[in-house]
């Protein structure tokens, strides 16, 4: 267990994804180019991204005692993600039905969230206490105290702040990563660069905003404001790209890249993941990432 570098805590799902040219209208039938079942969930996808990039990762969350739960475990085993911190709950494994539109380069999601997260088990607590980083999503952030972790006590904390963080105190975490839309809700009418600086200086941490295909921007006390453009790839689906970015960013930080370089590399990983229908299948390895960056200097 001590070998685990990053523990990801949060939502684990099995997704059914339909790739269509354009979204159906009400009462309309469209023919999908492809329909697949794949693993999903912000924390889960980040854990897979970390593993693909050579970081020893573990996932902590709740699944059901059902066929979907068994499929979750199979996927993580294949991806070499430690699952000893997963708990088996009383309810069905969380899942989503997702329609990904090629024309719109977007996706629409209907999700069945886990009804109740099981308490963090002892294996999970041991994994977390000995890790270098703890990465949490909108569900995992609510379980930090349960794991006995606060900022400065235990691993560094990264937060995938994709939902409802208008009033979140960023000083609770070391790496605060909302979307640009969430930052606009936190700071209405304020330029993104100013908003990032405000949160970073207030919390004395690193704050990064994802900006979709435009890339990402960040601010830390050490670097000041940095920005990194996105990459153009042949997009099949953007599903999970943000979750991939979060895992990739932590991987680059662990591997010693300074913030501006880490953002550029994480942008590239997220872009390359968009070649797949689902959020996981086309996440690159570090070798593939380096080759892509070499070709796109």
Predicted region positions:
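Conserved N-terminal subdomain of the carbohydrate kinase-like
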Residues: 26-30, 37, 52-133, 290-297
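Conserved beta-alpha-beta core of the PfkB/ribokinase-like small-molecule kinase fold
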Residues: 132-198, 206, 214-215
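Glycine-rich phosphate/adenosyl-contacting loop at the front of the ribokinase-like
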Residues: 1-60, 67-71, 234-235, 280, ...
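Hydrophobic anchor at the start of a short beta-strand
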Residues: 6, 56-57, 83-84, 157, ...
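Conserved phosphate-binding/catalytic region of the ribokinase-like
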Residues: 1-4, 166, 192-297
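Short, conserved phosphate/pyrophosphate- and ester-handling motifs at nucleotide-, phospho-/glycolipid
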Residues: 50, 179, 242
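Alpha-helical segments flanking ligand/cofactor-binding loops in enzyme cores
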Residues: 48, 73-74, 197, 260
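Short glycine/proline- and charge-enriched loop/turn segments
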Residues: 23-32, 177-180, 226-228
């Amino acid at each position: 267990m001590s070998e685990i570098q990053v523990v990801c805590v949060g939502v684990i799902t099995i997704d059914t994804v339909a790739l269509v040219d354009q979204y159906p209208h009400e009462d309309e039938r469209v023919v999908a180019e492809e329909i697949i079942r794949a693993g999903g969930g912000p924390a889960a996808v980040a854990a897979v991204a970390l593993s693909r990039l050579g970081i020893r990762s573990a996932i902590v969350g709740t699944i059901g005692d059902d066929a979907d739960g068994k499929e979750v475990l199979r996927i993580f085993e294949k991806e070499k993600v430690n699952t000893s911190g997963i708990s088996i709950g009383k309810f069905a494994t969380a899942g989503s039905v997702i329609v990904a539109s090629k024309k719109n380069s977007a996706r629409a999601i209907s999700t069945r969230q886990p009804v109740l997260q099981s308490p963090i088990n002892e294996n999970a607590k041991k994994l977390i206490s000995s890790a270098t980083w703890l990465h949490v999503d909108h569900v995992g952030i609510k379980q930090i105290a349960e794991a006995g972790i606060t900022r400065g006590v235990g691993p560094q904390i990264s937060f995938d702040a994709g939902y409802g963080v208008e009033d979140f105190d960023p000083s609770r975490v070391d790496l605060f990563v909302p979307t640009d839309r969430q930052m606009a809700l936190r700071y209405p009418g304020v330029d993104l660069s100013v908003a990032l600086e405000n949160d970073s200086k207030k919390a004395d941490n690193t704050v990064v905003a994802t900006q979709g295909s435009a890339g990402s921007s960040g601010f830390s006390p050490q670097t000041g404001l940095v920005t990194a453009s996105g990459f153009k790839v042949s997009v099949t689906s953007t599903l999970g790209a943000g979750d991939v970015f979060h895992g990739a960013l932590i991987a680059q930080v662990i591997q010693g890249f300074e913030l501006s370089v880490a953002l550029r590399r994480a942008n590239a990983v997220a872009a390359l993941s968009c070649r797949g229908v689902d959020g996981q299948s086309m996440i690159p390895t570090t070798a593939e990432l380096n080759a892509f960056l070499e070709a796109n200097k």
